Amino acid sequence: MSKFVLVKIETMSKEVYIVAAVRTPMGAFMGGLSTVPATELGAIAIKGALERSGVKPELVNEVFMGNVLQAGVGQAPAAQAALGAGLPNTVPCTTVNKVCASGMKSVMLGAQTIIAGDNEIVVAGGMENMSLTPHYVDGRNGTKFGNITMLDGITKDGLLDVYSKVPMGTCAEACAKEYNITREDQDNFAITSYKRAAAAWDAGKYDNEIVPVSVPQRKGDPIVISKDEEYTNVHLDKIPGLRPAFDKEGTITAANASTLNDGASALILASKEAVEKHGLKPIAKIVSYADAAQDPLWFTTAPSKAVPIALAKAGMTTKDVDFWELNQAFSVVGLANTQILGLDPEKVDVNGGAVALGHPLGSSGSRILVTLINVLKQNNAKIGGAGICNGGGGASAMIIENC
């Protein structure tokens, strides 16, 4: 792991506040949002965040948006989303690809520009439409004879370890063996995630973070999608009977892994000066953040490396954090990192996680920040921590404070 400097953000020249944090619902694969391009989902999230914050589009200094599966999306996806949300064409935009951590890294980059004094107000988040990801054909030189092989863009650019050529699920199997996490453990974790997600939706705990998406239809009125779709697409009693997906003797199944999804999320970041100047209302403050990396095959436990760095920068320990959001790329990821970090499972992903809600790659890192802010508000809590792994062996983490 690389060396790091323990510097608290609040001791720097700029404090970074979050003045809005929203997301679209997450659509099931080939579901209700499958026809809405990632950049349109991003635009909807950005527009919703701007409206929620009261920030006028012309006040935004820069935009960072995560997007992983970019083939066919078109040039400069972040700019497409920004312009679609009504931002001026003079606002610089950058698209970030750190696989599943893209959305969180976008927020980190946005915060850094504010701390450096380059910006006062930044839009940051992520977006993905996995349903629209194309298949690839290597036909540049033509095919003289024989069949043409097509590659799945989702697998090629999102779910395959580029070094060992094995799927992410194979890495998850190795993690389960290393930490003695059984199939039953993972199935129970998944069932808990689904139950928590359903209970949270029934109690209206997700309502405050959602920006509905109006989906045009060939005939008739548009259909408005205002709820996550994935958590209802399950029969809990069938989970224990599913076959392993990556190893016939393995423990990872379609049910205890996250799903393929479509969605976007966006946060509005502002300096203390901007908050005071424009009369903005902070909902959270960024206390610290960190990245970490290790062997790509062990991306599954990389959050357990990034989280301690973020905590050290904040001058905190795990005991100082009231609630956590850890990405549930697989149930084993949540279980392993909770175990390694010594966290209380009752304080982690309390409203369900990606196994039940969905995991649109470019949005996942910023989505858990959106949810974490709302969890802190719902429980009148102060400190929240978030961690997310990413393919290639990396992870990002962030500590926030409720305002």
Features from the language model and the residues they span:
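Condensing-enzyme catalytic core mediating Claisen C-C bond formation in acyl metabolism
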Residues: I9-V36, V234-T301, K305, V370-T371, ...
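N-terminal extracellular/periplasmic Venus flytrap/periplasmic-binding protein-like
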Residues: V22-T24, S34-I44, R52, D185-K277, ...
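Active-site pocket-shaping loop/turn-to-helix segments
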Residues: T24-L50, L69-A71, T94-M108, E120, ...
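Phosphate/pyrophosphate-binding loops at sites that engage ATP/ADP/AMP, CoA/4′-phosphopantetheine
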Residues: G48-N61, C175-N180, V275-G279, P308-F323, ...
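Conserved catalytic cysteine-centered active-site region
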Residues: N67-I121, L151, V162-P167, N233-T259, ...
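Active-site-proximal alpha-helical scaffold in enzymes
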Residues: V96-E128, A176-K205, A266-E273, T338, ...
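Flexible glycine-/small-residue-enriched beta->alpha junction loops
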Residues: I121-A174
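Active-site pocket-lining segment
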Residues: C171-E173, E209, Q217, V287-A356
